[in-house]
């Protein structure tokens, strides 16, 4: 009967969300959830919405993502055709056989990129549906009928935050010059784009659509590295000849009122959850 969101001393994710909702009372705070919830858990979600007017539980089942889908069989057949169109000496026969096997293994009723991630239930599942949600952006709330007194248009933007990102004060107006920004981690002087924060100023941002296009063409595409990072690189015409750290500086979401990635200082709650 508890709210099914991790809330431990080391990883107070639910508390972080409630704190954000309390500070940002004029913003809608969506919690995008998926899973087979017990009736008591759904009741607990409803009570959370009642206690905090701007918190909205958005169930994955209530959102139609079909416009972003593609048949798995089409992805595999396109890659098979690509291999078979090559001169024999350049074909990867091991890959070709693997693609044909994967094609033959697709079960009836599961010929869908989106459904394949529903069967995954790992990090890929999280990453993929995060991308889908950010393509919808503010439209998520409208489609789930979770707007309340708040004013949203169909092309409203959205900020995604991992639950270990702590809002300390009101964020105020947020200016994203190129319409998209993401979290950037820096380790030993090397920067890398991360999906712990994704901010867009509208739905269907072309950088995320570019990532979706990669997901629709690569048989082994990854929702994080391809769906986000490579999509952003493609949209902004990033070249490997350019300085990657400088590109990360350009695309980074920066804000003084957010403490970033606090779970890096604790044992991973995800690792404990799946072990």
Walk through the language-model features, giving the residues of each.
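Glycosyltransferase-associated regions of secretory-pathway enzymes
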Residues: 1-128, 159-275
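Solvent-exposed aromatic/hydrophobic patches embedded in short alpha-helical segments
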Residues: 125-140, 147-153
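Short beta-strand-to-loop acidic/aromatic patch adjacent to the donor-nucleotide binding site
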Residues: 140-148, 157-164
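Single-residue recognition of alpha-helix boundary sites
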Residues: 138-141, 173-175
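A generic hydrophobic-helix recognition signal that picks specific residues
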Residues: 120, 138, 155-157
